[in-house]
Amino acid sequence: MSAGQSTSQAAALAAFKSISTHPKTDQNPSKVHQSPERNVKRNPSGRLTNSRNATAVNAINRSPPKAPQKPQLSVVTASGHETKKNVENNRQRSSSPSPLYRTTTPKQMTSPSTSSASLPSNMIKSVKDSIEAKRHASEAKRLAQENQPSDMLTKIRQSINDRTRNIPNQAKVNERNMATINGIRESIESKRITTQANSSMIVLDTSSNSPYNFAPPDELRSPYEAHSPNYSYSSFESVPSAYSNPDSNIDLHDRGPETPSIVVDSPFNSQYDLSSPREDSDIDQERRNTAPILIPPSSNACARSANSAGSADDARSHLSSLKYQVEKEKNEDKNKKPKRKPPPELKPTTDLDGAFFSDSSSLNPGSSRSSLDAGSYSTDNESMGRNRMGSNDSDLSKPIKLPQYPELDTSSTKFKIRKRHGESNQNVGKMTESGSESDFEYPKATVPVSRATAPPLVHQKSQHVQLKTTMRDSKKKKKDKKSFDVDKPWKNHSDLDRISEADRKRYEGVWASNRGTYFNYVVTRINGIDYGSGGGSEQKIIVDEEDSMKAARLSAKQQADTVSGANGGYQSAEFHNITNAEISQLIHSSVVERIWERSRLPSETLRDIWELVDYRKDGTLNKPEFLVGMWLVDQCLYGRKLTKKVPASVWESLEGIGVSVKKKGKR
């Protein structure tokens, strides 16, 4: 035992000595890495040995990394006294500030960077440095807070001035714009030819083959010395008659101011040589003799001429003379213009269809067509108008030659004397009164006249045009509202004030099945019943009568009823059986109430109906009163309102015999 303890103590001392002899390279407390693997061996002597791989604390491993040196310590269980010492030593180690474990490797321990960075203060410092770096980076993007508002304004002004320096000068821009405008004006002026004074002359090459013929320059004078009309007859052409028409009698010195004019050659002149003599056509002659259109000068023109030539008084006098001259020339032109062509003369022509008047132009299509062709071009020349009018008058004066056809046989034309639609009887009478058919002279065949150009007939009168005021058909007569409409039978109002035969039969069936019931229980007195003679139950003698006698008796009874109706009608006492009645011909109010309640009408309505038909005032109704009451119930069910009084036509509809006779048709 002593030998074992001595060996263990020697090993422990050697380990502590080795730890104490090595210098401390780091200020931080070291940790001892203890391997979790423990080899527990039981000696044959009964002692437990704990062998573990341990590394020296803060020891520098100088061996190569492939085979690190790991001293093995064998733990030997000692007695209780030794174990107490070991526990105390472990407590001292645990209470010491150095930790038991260390995360750094021996290589990391040798490097100063790892040792310095592993400190908490260094870590906190590095975090602060990173935060400060980020804060300065974000502040660099913003404007400096040290700048004053005045400094900022100066910087903005400098930036604006720097930008304006790059913009080109406004004067240069204006010069450039003026240059472009002047170029446009020059191009316009080069294309326009004007004369404004005596000194301004136009020099043009007359020998060039230009489509425009200009007036000679020696004849261009001041435009305000005299008045000259503008002889333009269209918006594209201007033809001075003094140059184009050498035969005109217009004096050049008396025409007034002259303006340069442009003559546009027609396609005909461009195709043919004008210098070569040729025969002018009518169209060319008419185009050359076109009358001028006068254009008077304005007051501004006269004012300009006054400023250049003379005083203001001379200008005013000159202006008044010009106005007078212009008005005079206008009046002369109006007189020179040809008048409208008169209508052709109407000549009577005979035809089978009736007498009417027609002009010669309609019968001679060639002449009318030629006149239209010649008159299609409007001209102001007086000679042309007179010649044309004279030619038309000569055409009208000449006799018209109609084509001749062989005469037709009378046998083939005898059917043509019949009266036609729209022909008066006088024309037919004249043809028949002349004698035989051979005496009647038929007119020569003429050229048919179209319906569009034919004049209206003389005997036909213009009818007055009457416009429709509505789209409805006025020919249809207005139907009576009370008349029966087959298409709408539900809108028939003809039987509203009378009881129809079908309804009467239906009501009589209800009456026959309920009359005279429950009178055995009646205690009150009923009007018209003779209680002294046995309650009016008289036995009637049944007598066989012939049908003729029965019909005569019924007709006599009806006449008596009508006479009584004339005196009082349905309001009489006999009609309501007030003076004379039979129990079998009455119906009690309790029965009537049960029948009428089946209609499900309100009790107030049924009470009003009872008051309208109750003439007996004893709680009973006779046959006419019951039938009228049933009809009023049906009318209320149909939706009609009750009247204050039952119409007389309803009571009169019940006075008939009630016999319907059917007539058989003939075989």
Swiss-Prot record:
GO terms for biological process: lipid metabolic process. Residues 568-661 form the EH domain. SMART domains: EH. It comes from the Eukaryota. InterPro entries: EF-hand-dom_pair, EH_dom. The keyword tRNA-binding does not apply. Residues 1-10, 18-33, 46-61, 92-109, 234-248, 376-394, 424-437 have a biased composition (Polar residues). Residues 81-91, 133-144, 276-289, 325-335 have a biased composition (Basic and acidic residues). Positive regulator of phosphatidylinositol 4,5-bisphosphate turnover and negatively regulates signaling through the cell integrity pathway. Involved in rDNA silencing. Belongs to the IRS4 family. This is Increased rDNA silencing protein 4. The gene is IRS4.
